[in-house]
């Protein structure tokens, strides 16, 4: 059962009634009360909206006695948008800012039939009244040119965003041409403001991706005031509703780009619930070389990242079960000082490998790092050799199974050591994987690095790793790999 929420207000004399329309794929059921006074005329079971059939027609004859031409715009709430993307698909978008609700219904059949029914009702009501323009609620843009209608749409949406949500800055583009806007309908019951803003351009198709709200080219970040509601894709700049973003595994719903995940989110993704047992979680750095910066002392910087992320270091290690198979896993977190590898990170990963060696467990290390931590000097570089030595004993002497998962970004010392030592090396789609960054190479060698030459897809063709696996398939793929190598569930 799919539901389209239209928190609309119907006027009938002095009474107001709030409704919820519940819709299945085949029919639109009776209109039911959610609040308001009982009205026997509206509550009668015979006052139903008939089924939506293949012909696309709908009979409103049973309810026309309480709907007037002035009320048809109240059928859709002020917070509901009807839009069409560049492919011609129709969507309804519902906002409830107060309750932080954002819902999208993309069943084009329902929207098209709804639009058709409303248009038919408007035509019939206008004929009964004798003139379309006799009503003061008649929208002058309804039968105007497409250009004027598009301008009106942009004006309404711009006014809604700026006044209803109180956005301080414009969501704007640099053009006054709205001919490429795919927003085709916006139904509201407020009077049209005389001030039409021509500085906003809200597009539902940018570079082949639908429902992107494009801001100024020099300001791609979302307004800080609403970052608790939205996550902006760093690839297509589309907005993802935060409430659903985590359930989608931090994958952009517009372009499929894999955005960064925290180490805790990755543990939740890979480890069976209730089986996670962390190792060495209280190990912290003691500033071994007493590194001090004019901007911020190293210890103070460590403390600030600990408060920001809730982690003690840039890696979490522990044991758990993946589809019932006991494993040892280390997950690096780029949010903690760029996932840089210091003495504590190296020690925790080494201890994890040694524990797995003694317990004969398969090992997974999820890499997300900018490389060695410069604040610890040569001690951070030593971790590369220390981890590689532990892996040598684990893989060659004990003949156990190690899987390296490379996420974006994986660079520097991590790439040069345990990141590329896996028996199976898996990369995420679009992951940035390199030893030296693009700018470092260009400034050092004075040569241009081609775009995409450090992306997972290009490196896969060059044989740098074995698989590119999307997040939603990763756990299943790992489970099959472990069983193929002789590791089976406990039960």
From Swiss-Prot:
Zn(2+) binds at residues 233, 236, 252, 255. Binds 1 zinc ion per subunit. It is found in: Plastid, Chloroplast stroma. SUPFAM superfamilies: ClpP/crotonase. Signal peptide: none annotated. It is an enzyme of class 2 (transferase). Its cofactor is Zn(2+). Its EC number is 2.1.3.15. Pathway: Lipid metabolism; malonyl-CoA biosynthesis; malonyl-CoA from acetyl-CoA: step 1/1. Component of the acetyl coenzyme A carboxylase (ACC) complex. Biotin carboxylase (BC) catalyzes the carboxylation of biotin on its carrier protein (BCCP) and then the CO(2) group is transferred by the transcarboxylase to acetyl-CoA to form malonyl-CoA. Acetyl-CoA carboxylase is a heterohexamer composed of biotin carboxyl carrier protein, biotin carboxylase and 2 subunits each of ACCase subunit alpha and ACCase plastid-coded subunit beta (accD). This is Acetyl-coenzyme A carboxylase carboxyl transferase subunit beta, chloroplastic. It comes from Lemna minor (Common duckweed). The gene is accD.
